[in-house]
A protein has these predicted regions:
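TPR-adjacent "capping" and linker segments in tetratricopeptide-repeat scaffold/adaptor proteins
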Residues: 131-151, 176-180
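Structural signature of alpha-solenoid helical repeat junctions
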Residues: 146, 163, 183, 220-223, ...
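Glycine- and acidic-residue-biased ligand/ion/polar-headgroup-sensing regions
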Residues: 27-46, 66-69, 78, 84-86, ...
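Short solvent-exposed coil/turn linkers within tandem alpha-helical repeat scaffolds
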Residues: 177-182, 211-223
Length: 238
């Protein structure tokens, strides 16, 4: 898919990887407090292991919190709190500039180009089904295999820790790996709102328009229409 991008876009992404990844590798993620059931695993393992206080986590690891559980992780002098029923990758716990976010969004768009199955249809991957969720509070009635929803909860935790860019990208990755989580309007609205708050109005507008196609409550539909009208006015004045 790189051959479909303009050369300048490829260069920008290469420079992003060259400059950003080494600084990320130099960071340390240390567990400083654990409450309740918190586990971790690497990307290459299906086995979850109990997390210990004082443990230093690797970039390729995930953490997952149980009901009424939480974990505090120290990184570069900052404390990141991940609350209950959430899952995040350690690599996603990072600050992103607006330029880094835009490049990461471009990379996600490239990855998300549907693969043809030879019959003119894209392959959607996962067939897991998730129900609608009201609001953006943590759902405490998850099944043990609802890892896609736990990841979206984790993305919300990133946003609550002021890691807005990482929150958006982690949510996008989750939608790609667990496609049916995209049908849950409350999450889509939450992350579109994050884009709006970041001042990325065109990107937010695209998300709001896509979310309009989902099953919405009257309140959600009204709020979406109002936000779309607000963005239209903002873009018209620029």
């Amino acid at each position: 898919m790189l051959n479909k991008m303009k050369p300048g876009g490829v260069v920008k992404i290469f420079l992003f990887l060259l400059l950003f990844v080494p600084s990320l590798l130099a960071q340390e993620y240390k567990v400083i407090h654990i409450k309740g059931d918190v586990k971790f695993r690497s990307n290459t393992s299906e086995t979850w292991t109990e997390l210990k206080g004082g443990q230093v986590l690797n970039l390729d690891e995930f953490i997952s919190t149980g009901v009424k559980a939480s974990v505090q992780i120290e990184n570069l002098g900052n404390i990141i709190i991940i609350e209950e029923l959430s899952a995040v990758s350690i690599a996603s716990i990072k600050k992103m500039s607006t330029d880094e976010l835009l490049l990461a969004l471009a990379m996600e768009d490239m990855i998300n180009v549907p693969k043809s199955d030879g019959k003119g249809k894209g392959n959607s991957g996962s067939t897991a089904v998730y129900g609608e969720k009201e609001g953006t509070e943590i759902n405490t009635e998850l099944n043990s295999d609802d890892f896609g929803i736990k990841r979206l909860n984790g993305a919300i935790q990133l946003a609550k820790n002021d890691l807005m860019g990482s929150s958006i990208i982690f949510a996008k990755e989750t939608y790609r790996k667990y496609p049916n989580t995209k049908q849950i309007a409350s999450y889509r609205i939450f992350f579109a709102d994050v884009l709006y708050e970041k001042g990325l109005y065109e990107e937010a507008l695209g998300e709001y328009i896509e979310t309009q196609k989902l099953e919405l409550s009257e309140e959600q539909r009204t709020n979406l229409n109002n936000r779309i009208n607000d963005i239209d006015k903002l873009l018209l004045n620029h």
